[in-house]
Regions:
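Hydrophobic alpha-helical transmembrane segments of multi-pass integral membrane proteins
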Residues: 1-446
Length: 446
């Protein structure tokens, strides 16, 4: 085998730490903003004109999907893609630039939320969203070079899901900026949610789920051909969903039931990931990330609420409860679990010795149960508890889960470097026979 120059991509391993720290800090601020929006002063959203409510929902939604969750995913990408594709077409200054744009954009939006004034929020969020959009646009050329440098053998377990996530980044950035520049245009509001959350983030989430169970743990979920077909069908379902949303917005389709199309790609990735095989391994005692397993399990409930919301809930701000569940119950849990697993790989902790993140999983369970109750309450089927109290409990549960992640990351990543290695254990142990001439894969820890 041809030897790969160590200098070509060796330095990129372990480059995720700065972005993880940015995420850990800003998600605490986000939880405060979430409480301020939905629990402290619910009239700010519920009793506001539809357009103003849309702006507030868009602001609180931009923070995770382009801010602190995106920081974690970009950090994972900076660490893993050079290992997967044996190429690092970027330098350390880019990582610092991404971190600065990310935290700067989030701070501007959070300050706008805390002002409780729609004019201030709009102007500050436009500036913040521009910074957040710019960070992913900058990754476009790098993503293309990584895509062009790959070989057919690279990343076969994730394949198009990872490639598609990379190549979609500039599109996500452009749509984000346009959605805030044209924030009074309902078409771009719909475009933001359908493309970025329902499409892009669902794709990223499945890439991480597949990377964990099939690539990292070696559980056989699907072959390369099945992988390609699954991706093609997913893209088709997302496109159909986007078209139906726009036809409903234009009035060409008046039946709100078409909004249930959001559940189609969610159900698809749930069943195509073979939950029977996942749970067969879990019940057999095989270890995995409890957070990623929990996120995968919540896909089914999220899809069910999507159908329920389309049928029973009349609201003008989109599939609010479904997307809330998708962001926090599925996307955030998957990204948290992937982040923890990657960091523990860098600490060379054996899988059987890793701690379960039960506090986070339980808090997300409480939050998701609260969202489901609020959806059923809005649909007129459950009226047992005061919805404002339930909303407060859900936000507090999310705050505790975010705090748990923050405490873990600070204590483990900032103050404890005793067992940290630049090369994660997964890569130091894989393919030893085929890469013995490559200095990048040592046979001993560094």
């Amino acid at each position: 085998m041809k030897s790969t120059s160590k200098e070509s991509y060796n330095w990129a391993a372990g480059s995720y730490i700065d972005l993880f720290i940015v995420s850990a800090v800003t998600q605490i601020f986000f939880a405060i903003g979430l409480y301020w929006t939905f629990a402290s002063d619910t009239s700010w959203v519920n009793e506001a004109p539809v357009l103003q409510s849309n702006i507030r929902i868009l602001a609180i939604g931009t923070l995770p999907v382009l801010g602190w969750v995106m920081a974690l995913v970009i950090g994972i990408g900076f660490d893993r893609f050079p290992l997967d594709y044996k190429s690092a077409p970027f330098d350390p200054s880019l990582i610092s630039t991404i971190a600065a744009l990310n935290i700067g954009g989030q701070i501007l939006i959070i300050v706008g939320i805390l002002t409780s004034q729609i004019e201030s929020l709009e102007s500050l969020a436009q500036m913040g969203a521009t910074l957040l959009g710019a960070q992913v646009i900058l990754l476009g050329p790098i993503s293309w070079r990584l895509y062009k440098s790959r070989s057919p053998e690279d990343n076969v377990n994730v394949r198009m899901w990872g490639i598609g996530s990379m190549l979609a980044l500039p599109v996500v950035g452009v749509i984000t900026i346009l959605s805030w520049i044209l924030v009074h245009n309902d078409w771009f509001y719909i475009l933001f949610w359908t493309v970025i959350l329902d499409g892009f983030w669902l794709m990223v989430t499945f890439a991480l789920i597949l990377a964990h169970f099939q690539d990292r743990l070696g559980w056989k979920l699907m072959g390369p051909e099945e992988n390609g077909r699954a991706f093609a069908i997913f893209v088709f379902l997302v496109i159909i969903h986007i078209i139906l949303e726009f036809l409903h917005q234009s009035g060409d389709i008046t039946d709100s039931y078409v909004k249930a199309s959001i559940s189609a790609p969610i159900l698809w990735i749930f069943f195509v990931s073979r939950p029977d095989r996942i749970w067969k391994n879990v019940l057999a005692g095989e270890k995995c990330s409890s957070q990623i397993l929990s996120a995968h399990s919540w896909l089914l409930a999220t899809a069910a609420i999507g159908i329920y919301e389309a049928i029973y809930i009349e609201e003008a701000i989109g599939m609010f409860y479904t997307r809330l569940m998708l962001i926090f119950g599925v996307v955030v849990q998957t990204v948290w679990g992937s982040s923890v697993y990657l960091h523990e790989d860098h600490n060379h902790i054996e899988i059987e010795n890793r701690k379960s993140r039960l506090i986070s999983v339980i808090m997300i369970f409480i939050m998701m149960a609260g969202i489901i109750y609020l959806a059923l309450n809005a649909g007129g089927h459950v009226t047992i508890f005061n919805p404002e109290i339930v909303a407060t409990i859900a936000v507090v549960a999310l705050f505790i889960a975010a705090s748990d992640f923050f405490i873990w990351l600070v204590s483990d990543a900032i103050f404890n470097h005793d067992n940290w290695h630049r090369i994660p254990m997964y890569y130091t142990n894989m393919h030893k026979d085929s890469v013995t001439d490559d200095d990048y894969f040592p046979n001993e820890s560094e």
